């Protein structure tokens, strides 16, 4: 069996979780790590939170455990939920004070990408440590590492603060009301690439992670590709959040694409900037200088199918 640690996912993780008697979602998150540490303490093993060969030898000799109710500090049920669209959403909340507690009624949904690496937990942790105030989106979607193609977090959806709370994620627009009544998703992606397939920080993108658009967007042809899993997860999320918050996801971006085509549809739109378009929008619809999200053909097709 392979070594497992926080961020691992797959059938081996489900086997581990069943053996430990916790809910088996197949993702090695914070609560699985705590269960591993507890097992290591019980067996007088070094407490690392990592499942190596020695620990596997002990684990595989266990009978499958019935999922147990455990104390509030380690209750795995509090760490994720499953939507009616069969999407698991993991909870990894920012510290209080790093988001607006609300309650807030959302009337807009925004798609962003992080211009960062693939780990959604690390993105949220970074927000919690920075000094920019309450800047965050409610949700972050993991992706594929652009350098080494590691897919541990690919398609993993994480919630950064409770439903009804708010983070600032748009910057300066023509509508303060829109800024305060919008829910956002950050898709983990490095964004645009230069002609040498390098990111804005100078790292080289693996060939499998590159997409070339038919038409340049914001002056860029090459981009870190959104993965198939990310696009599928985004669709499930849009349907869930649109229903949760009463936002019609067919309005806004879908209409822009139908009217102007994908390149212009993802670009700046005056009415969107002033908050006049309630529905689904891209960050670039309301900010001239933003390139998130870009019109990946599969993302465009998904939005048109809504």
Q: What are these model-derived regions, one by one?
A:
Residues 70-80, 191-306:
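Basic/polar, cationic surfaces and motifs that engage anionic cell-wall
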Residues 82-248:
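Active-site-adjacent loop/helix surface patches within enzyme catalytic domains
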Residues 9, 115-116, 286-287:
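Short polar catalytic/cofactor-binding loops
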Residues 42-48, 64-68, 287-292:
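Secretory-pathway/luminal and periplasmic proteins that interact with or process carbohydrate-rich
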Residues 2-61, 273:
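Short acidic, glycine/serine/threonine-rich helix-capping segments at coil-helix boundaries
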Residues 57, 62-86:
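Intrinsically disordered, low-complexity
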């Amino acid at each position: 069996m392979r070594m497992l640690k926080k961020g691992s996912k797959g059938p081996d993780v489900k086997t581990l979780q069943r053996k430990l008697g916790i809910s088996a979602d197949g993702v090695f998150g914070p609560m699985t790590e705590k269960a591993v540490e507890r097992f290591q303490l019980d067996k007088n093993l070094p407490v690392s939170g990592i499942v190596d060969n020695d620990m596997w030898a002990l684990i595989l000799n266990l009978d499958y455990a019935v999922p147990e109710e455990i104390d509030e500090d380690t209750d795995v049920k509090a760490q994720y939920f499953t939507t009616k669209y069969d999407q698991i959403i993991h909870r990894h909340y920012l510290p209080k004070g790093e988001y607006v507690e609300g309650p807030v009624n959302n009337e807009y949904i925004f798609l962003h990408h992080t211009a960062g690496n693939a780990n959604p937990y690390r993105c949220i942790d970074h927000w919690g440590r920075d000094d920019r105030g309450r800047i965050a989106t409610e949700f972050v979607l993991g992706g594929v590492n652009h350098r080494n193609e590691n897919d541990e977090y690919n398609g993993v959806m994480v919630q950064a603060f409770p439903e009804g709370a708010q983070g600032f994620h748009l910057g300066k627009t023509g509508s303060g009301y829109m800024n305060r009544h919008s829910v956002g998703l950050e898709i983990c992606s490095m964004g645009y690439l230069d002609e040498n397939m390098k990111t804005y920080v100078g790292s080289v993108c693996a060939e499998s992670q590159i997409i070339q658009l038919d038409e340049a967007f914001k002056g860029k042809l090459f981009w870190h590709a959104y993965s198939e899993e990310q696009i599928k997860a985004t669709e499930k999320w849009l349907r869930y959040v649109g229903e949760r918050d009463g936002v019609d996801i067919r309005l806004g971006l879908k209409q822009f694409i139908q009217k102007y085509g994908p390149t212009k549809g993802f670009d700046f739109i005056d009415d969107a900037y002033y908050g006049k378009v309630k529905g689904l929008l891209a960050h670039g619809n309301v900010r001239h200088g933003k390139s998130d999200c870009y019109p990946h053909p599969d993302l465009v097709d998904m939005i048109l199918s809504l």
